Amino acid sequence: MFDYFRKEIEWAGRPLILETGKVARQADGAVMITYGDTVVLCTAVGAKSVKPGQDFFPLTVNYQEKAYAAGKIPGGFFKREGRPSEAEVLNARLIDRPIRPLFPENFRNEVQITATVLSYDNENDPALVSLIGCSAALTLSGIPFFGPVACARIGRIDGKLVVNPTHDEIKDSTLDLMVAGTAEGVLMVESEASELSEETMLEAVTLGHTSFQPVIDAIIALAEHAAKAPWDLPSLTKEEIALRKRVEKVGNKLMADAYKERQKQARYKKVAEAKDRINEILADEGLDVELAKPMLKELEAQVVRGSILKTGIRIDGRDLKTVRPILAEVGILPRAHGSSLFTRGETQALVVATLGTGQDEQIIDALEGEYRSNFMLHYNFPPYSVGECGRMGSPGRREIGHGKLAWRAIHPLLPSKEAFPYTMRVVSEITESNGSSSMATVCGSSLALMDAGVPLPRPVAGIAMGLIKEDRGYAVLSDILGDEDHLGDMDFKVAGTADGVTALQMDIKITSITPEIMKIALEQAREGRIHILGEMAKALTEGRGEVSGNAPKITTISVPKEKIRDVIGSGGKVIREIVEYSGAKVDIGDDGTVTIAASNDEQAQKAIARIEGIVAEPEIGRIYEGKVVKTADFGAFVNFLGPRDGLVHISELAEGRVAKTSDVVKQGDAVKVKVIGFDDRGKVKLSMRVVDQATGADITESVGAKPGRPPRRDAE
């Protein structure tokens, strides 16, 4: 019934199993991949024809985590999986990026790749497993694909690089790096690091590339038994070949002249005019203008790339290493907790930092369980930033990806919760863009956080590198423009401090690059980063001495764990009363840490005093404020120190004989009491008689320690 094939290898100490022919047999390619007890179903399907007029390659990657994979039932009203989470979007991008450049340049059929996590063992990263599985599914499908691709995750634990660390091991790692590529070279890198050197980062990339070679061999071995016949690729017709030559001849000078304009918007206008003029000439000659559209894009790339390689001068007139002019400003928004405006050439980010309390932490429900994050970084890219009309609304995949990259760059420098008990949210509004907006976000975020008073040990900066690579040579570009990104072969983003790298993301648009090019790019990026940090230092060099006056003032105290329930009270009654009484926000953790957020010191001290009163043990001889909760013939019960009650015997209500308790106090009265002892059952004995109810002063000496007995006076 099944035409079943299986390939198993031992990889990084665990079995990796690739299976095909049993599940999802109607997909062009389907692989069930197992690593440890993590299981992912990966499929690849391609449309058999191209949609008329389509001049791009429509590749879609869907990554989905099923709750049942971790033995869970989804939350929410509908109890089923909904829209992709941020983690799912990021993992889909992780799969897309190394796969996309390996399809033929003239391939236009729609391709859909799906990775469904069916089982998760809390050890082996499902994103890594999914990327390998999707590569295998494509390799088997017959769809034109210059793979296979594989990947590895590299950690650095106790100073040693580790291949595919488990979920628990990565928590103690100073590096979390994912590297993907073919047998020939690296295609993608994504990492977060604790200020590591460029040499260490390159060593990790090299180790990753070496470590996944057995996986590529396993995919090839599976394909030898189970791959479908490859699709035929349409070759260029004689008409298309002739048209391409004519486009190059007619358009070369027109396009080169247009790209002499240095300013972005003016250049775009001249390029559009050049394309219109080329189309006019082609139309006058009776040639197919629609067919020439992709050829015009190719011509544009040839002109720009050829000029840079030949002259060493870039689109905006810079040489290969020069960074665009930078202006950094801080404190530009009066009511924000921290703000910055970072401008680099025609790229600009308005970044705002907001400080909150533990109640503002983001709750994330992931396969590995629910956890909280006290740092959020959100990146917004409105269409006006590039002078266009477009969609506004919820963030797209690109915005989520750029925000996460900036998050990785800043995260290693953040203080611990114990040292800085605030929740931090940073929002980057890209107000202008001409390349490297994610790296502008890194620079602006660092400045905004320091402006808010977050004690970053060192500022963080980022730079985007590019590559032009042809048979006759290559050029590594610092601080690339948008056009250099689109028309180049590499987008290599490096962020870090003066001491080392904190984040690295590399995407290659050609089949691979050499370690030599990576080394040059990393060194050039370091030079650029140091320059940018110097420009940022003109605005701010370190966090302000205290948090913004607009931010809440947070104080932390600790209470014994056994007293937590007393502070919270039944149904949260006590903690709500503390909040109402003080005006401060109060949050208590499972370990007894109480976080108090207030707009001024008075509110904080009122909350602290009330909490300390609740958790304190009554001391004999000490005076407390309380409330009468019940009266009886023999006295009154007074609530004090939070939930604690004590008895004021009728003889201790007031000086002299008291006929009825209600003659002195009624339920609900606020009173001042002194602890005079404990009975044989440990109950607290209180006295109002020895306390001045107006001032709270102890008047034992004047009224006597016991009722009816005036104090003994020494004879004169």
Curated annotation (Swiss-Prot):
Gene3D superfamilies: GHMP Kinase, N-terminal domain, K Homology domain, type 1, Nucleic acid-binding proteins
Organism superkingdom: Bacteria
Single annotated GO MF: magnesium ion binding
Alphabetized UniProt keyword annotations: Cytoplasm, Magnesium, Metal-binding, Nucleotidyltransferase, RNA-binding, Transferase
One Pfam entry name: KH_1
Binding site for Mg(2+): D485, D491
Top-tier EC class: transferase
Record's GO cellular component terms: cytosol
GO biological process: mRNA catabolic process; RNA processing
Compartments (UniProt record): Cytoplasm
Obligatory cofactor(s): Mg(2+)
InterPro entries in alphabetical order: ExoRNase_PH_dom1 (IPR001247), ExoRNase_PH_dom2 (IPR015847), ExoRNase_PH_dom2_sf (IPR036345), KH_dom (IPR004087), KH_dom_type_1 (IPR004088), KH_dom_type_1_sf (IPR036612), NA-bd_OB-fold (IPR012340), PNPase (IPR012162)
Domain S1 motif, residue spans: 621-689
Chief location category: cytoplasm
Catalytic activity: RNA(n+1) + phosphate = RNA(n) + a ribonucleoside 5'-diphosphate
Magnesium listed as a keyword: yes
Domain KH: 552-611
Record's function text: Involved in mRNA degradation. Catalyzes the phosphorolysis of single-stranded polyribonucleotides processively in the 3'- to 5'-direction.
Similarity comment: family membership: Belongs to the polyribonucleotide nucleotidyltransferase family.
PANTHER family: POLYRIBONUCLEOTIDE NUCLEOTIDYLTRANSFERASE (PTHR11252), POLYRIBONUCLEOTIDE NUCLEOTIDYLTRANSFERASE 1, MITOCHONDRIAL (PTHR11252:SF0)
The protein's name in its UniProt record: Polyribonucleotide nucleotidyltransferase
Organism from which the protein derives: Gluconobacter oxydans (strain 621H)
Lineage: Bacteria, Pseudomonadati, Pseudomonadota, Alphaproteobacteria, Acetobacterales
Gene: pnp
